């Protein structure tokens, strides 16, 4: 694991700006308003040759009650305890404040290496603030500008000196290896020349390309990438119980929670292991209707949540048991499915429901009726607060992930297609039959299929949905979006023996 570096300091000294610079992209929300960061946020970054596991923390306030600020302080203290090295940031333009001095006292008691940096050190006012920071007792401060990238070389040297030669070399040796080409990428690369959106491509060429690619053989040869973490995003409306659910899963107060709606602002990522399987949990800010997203900061949080959803594998949509399946829930589910993510429906606060049997039947009925595109997504009824039924969530997530990554063998797929068309053929258009001829799965994540059919451009949307639902049931792909592209053209077997239809397909022996 890379060196764990916690960036700490009072509110609005530039911690998240420095965090984003070291990560190399904008992950933490940044705003002039103090207290933007509330949870501790983690990401991998780099400073020169030194790989880092960075922890961005909430601003440190000197409070001791049960307020939101006190809980934010507890998250910061947890980050300090977890880190190998602390980067203590002060504002050079303001100078040392009583809050900075209190924080310095806390760090001295923590018995952990500390690097002191004075941010916003541009200009004469900044120079005076750097000099003032000497009195905090952590040696020579590093003057820097996180916004403009100034002082990074000096920061690197200070971190290296604080670690010492042995710890520094160990940090370099224990860094994770660079990204390796994942299994399955070769398959997609072989199919890259097949543009299923290209309506100028003849069916003969498309069918030939599909068969030449020998998809089933490639899939059989490709090793299962079991070490790849499942990226699970926890999404939902504000105060639905998302952070409480993650804390219950992790068995720790990793996420800041409380009765106030909208506590989580950033998308917080936590690496976790469940029954030997690596999981990357992402807690997100609550999504509201657009007309209720008024503050600039909340708009930034909403955009960050949508970005996290787009990069997830599976989305757990958390809904309050007493307010489930409202319009905003349906819109979030629709967004996840349109982005090609697998979906698990989570009904939280189940410990507060009296008639659980009746409520469960009602919610499942609503899900089937109002979320037809979710395709029978599993529904898990649980309580993040008490842990009731919490053990049912991850098996449902892993099952949907397997469906999301599943592939149907081409032979099985076409046998199913022939049987389906024989029993329920597509309707005629202007007295002329539509003849589905050949189907292949082009990719997984999500499962994507192409169907070759005469007059395919005239196939009714209702029949396409019928085929998608049939694929879902026949190949057990529930809770995941299924994409079907229909292409038209002449009979690819015309002029051959048995030209009135496609030949029988045999299962490949892999």
From Swiss-Prot:
PROSITE patterns: G_ENGA. One of its GO terms (molecular function) is GTP binding. One of its GO terms (biological process) is ribosome biogenesis. Residues 406-490 form the KH-like domain. Residues 3-167, 230-405 form the EngA-type G domain. GTPase that plays an essential role in the late steps of ribosome biogenesis. This is GTPase Der. It comes from Hyphomonas neptunium (strain ATCC 15444).
């Amino acid at each position: 694991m890379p060196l764990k570096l916690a960036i700490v300091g009072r509110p609005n000294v530039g911690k998240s700006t420095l965090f984003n610079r070291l990560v190399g992209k904008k992950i933490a929300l940044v705003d002039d308003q103090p207290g933007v960061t509330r949870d501790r946020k983690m990401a991998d970054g780099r400073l020169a040759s030194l790989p880092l596991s960075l922890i961005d923390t909430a601003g440190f306030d000197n409070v001791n009650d049960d307020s939101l600020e006190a809980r934010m302080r507890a998250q910061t203290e947890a980050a300090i305890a977890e880190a190998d090295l602390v980067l203590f940031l002060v504002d050079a333009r303001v100078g040392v404040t009583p809050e900075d001095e209190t924080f310095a006292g806390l760090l001295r008691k923590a018995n952990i290496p500390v690097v002191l940096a004075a941010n916003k050190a541009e200009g004469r006012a900044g120079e005076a603030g750097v000099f003032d920071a000497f009195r905090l007792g952590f040696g020579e401060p590093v003057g820097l500008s996180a916004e403009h990238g100034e002082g990074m070389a000096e920061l690197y040297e200070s971190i290296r000196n604080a670690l010492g030669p042995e710890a520094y070399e160990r940090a370099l040796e224990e860094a994770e290896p660079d990204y390796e080409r994942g299994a399955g990428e070769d398959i997609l690369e072989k199919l890259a020349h097949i543009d299923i959106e290209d309506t100028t491509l003849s069916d003969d060429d498309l069918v030939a390309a599909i068969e030449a690619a020998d998809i089933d053989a490639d899939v059989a040869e490709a090793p299962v990438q079991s070490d790849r973490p499942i990226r699970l995003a926890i999404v939902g409306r504000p105060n639905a119980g998302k952070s409480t659910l993650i804390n219950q899963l992790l068995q720790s107060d990793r996420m800041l929670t409380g009765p106030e709606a909208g506590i989580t602002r950033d998308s917080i990522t936590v690496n976790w292991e469940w029954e030997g399987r690596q999981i990357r949990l992402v807690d997100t800010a609550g999504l509201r209707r657009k007309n209720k997203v008024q503050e600039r900061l909340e708009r930034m949080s909403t955009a960050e949540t949508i970005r996290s959803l787009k990069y997830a594998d599976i989305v757990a949509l958390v809904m309050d048991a007493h307010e489930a399946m409202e319009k905003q829930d349906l819109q979030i589910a629709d967004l996840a499915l349109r982005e090609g993510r697998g979906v698990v429906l989570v009904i939280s606060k189940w410990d507060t429901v009296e008639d659980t049997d009746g409520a469960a039947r009602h919610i499942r009925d609503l899900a089937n009726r109002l979320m037809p595109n979710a395709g029978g997504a599993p529904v898990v009824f649980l309580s993040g607060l008490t842990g009731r039924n919490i053990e049912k969530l991850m098996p449902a997530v892993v099952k949907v992930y397997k469906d999301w990554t599943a592939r149907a063998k081409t032979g099985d797929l076409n046998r199913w297609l022939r049987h389906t068309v024989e029993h329920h053929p597509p309707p005629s258009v202007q007295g002329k039959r539509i003849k589905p001829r050949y189907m292949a799965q082009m990719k997984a994540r999500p499962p994507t299929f192409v169907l070759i059919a005469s007059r395919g451009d005239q196939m009714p949307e209702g029949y396409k949905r019928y085929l998608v639902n049939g694929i879902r049931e026949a190949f057990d792909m529930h809770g995941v979006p299924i994409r079907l592209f229909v292409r038209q053209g002449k009979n690819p077997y015309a002029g051959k023996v048995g030209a009135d239809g496609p030949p029988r397909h045999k299962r490949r022996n892999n």
